[in-house]
Amino acid sequence: KKFRAKQIYEWMHIHHVTSFDEMTNLSKNLRETLKEKADLIVLEEELVQISKIDGTRKYLFALADGNMIESVLMKYKHGNSVCVSSQVGCRMGCRFCASTLDGLERNLTPSEMLRQVYQIQKITGERVSNIVIMGTGEPLDNYDNFLKFIHMVSDEHGLNISQRNIT
C-alpha cells in the first residue's frame, strides 16, 4: 500500500529509526512482519576522536558483520559536512593511503553509506548539509552502490541534500 510505504520511508529517512518497534504509527502486526522480512542497518559507534584544533570528529563504526568503517564530521560556518566511507578497505594501492594496507574486504551497500550520515545526525542532533565521499575505499570501484547512495541521500522526501553539495 502506497500510504504504508510512505510511512515506513519517513521513519527510515526522516526519523532515522534503528528498530521497527520505533515505527509507532504502524500496527504491531506490521512491525512484526517487517522484523521477520527485513533488516534495518545499524552502525555501532566504537570510538570517536575529536580534534582539539577545529572540533572535527572522526567516528569508528562497527558494521553488522564486524567490519569497521570510518566517517568524519567537519563543522563549518556554512553547515556540517560528513566524509563517508564507500568500502571496507581498498584495492587501489595508493602509497599515501592507509585504507589499502589490508586490501579490499568488501563494498558497502547504499544503506550502509547512508546510515553513516544518519548516525552522525542522530549523535549530534544536527543536520548534515554536505557529503564528501573520501572516507575508506574508492567510490568509483563501488559505482552502482555509490550511485544508489547519491539518489537516496538527495531524495526530496529524505535528507534532500543537493547533488551539488556531494563531492
Please identify what each model-predicted range represents.
Residues 1-80:
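Flexible, acidic/Gly-rich N-terminal and inter-domain linker regions that tether
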Residues 67-88, 92-167:
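Conserved Radical SAM active-site core
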